A protein has these predicted regions:
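Polar low-complexity intrinsically disordered regions
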Residues: 1, 21-23
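Bacterial N-terminal signal peptides that target proteins for export
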Residues: 1-8
Length: 174
């Protein structure tokens, strides 16, 4: 058995054993473990994933729902709103600090009907503050947010749909 298969199997067993609880860094799929960083902040996100009906690149394929952007509010462990998450993807704190991310790794969510878990590399694009030193973001514990299973027709008015989702974002610094 390959190492990746072993890591995935162990992670899934750990997740199954901890069903109903938040994932810990120890239960992550191997490909999502942040490299040499320490967790600085854990945020809960509640919002929507916005999809738009677009023509497929192949003219013989049907139109498809394509992710446009997330729109979510970010909350600390005490339930206080501390920022927002939006297109880019960006995370912006209420103090004005902001980061933009790019996907480094992804893994299917253990829960059916949930958007994937992600590891993103980030860079600061705002002023100094809570998010300015963040170098990686981990998206875990996702619920919902998946594109509609129904077909779409490009050019039809209302060709966008907002799908509710929630997730935990763990922010890391070097």
């Amino acid at each position: 058995m390959k190492l990746l298969d072993v890591c995935a199997s162990l992670s899934l067993m750990t997740l199954a054993a901890c069903a109903g609880t938040a994932a810990s860094e120890q239960s992550l799929p191997c490909e999502l473990k942040p490299a040499a960083a320490s967790s600085s902040l854990r945020l809960a996100a509640r919002g929507v994933q916005i999809y738009e009906c677009r023509t497929a690149p192949d003219p013989y394929s049907p139109a498809q729902w394509t992710l446009v952007a997330p729109e979510a509010e970010l909350f600390d462990v005490g339930g206080q709103r501390v920022g927002r998450h939006f297109a880019g993807p960006h995370w912006e704190a209420t103090d004005g600090s902001r980061i933009v991310g790019s996907v480094k790794a992804r893994a299917d969510a253990p829960q059916r009907g949930a958007i994937p878990w992600l590891l993103l590399g980030t860079k600061s694009v705002g002023g100094p503050g809570h998010f300015s030193g963040v170098t990686q973001v981990l998206r875990i514990n996702t619920v919902g947010g998946v594109a509609p299973a129904t077909a779409c027709s490009p050019g039809v008015p209302g060709g966008r749909v907002s799908v509710p989702y929630s997730a935990d974002y763990v922010l890391f610094t070097d």
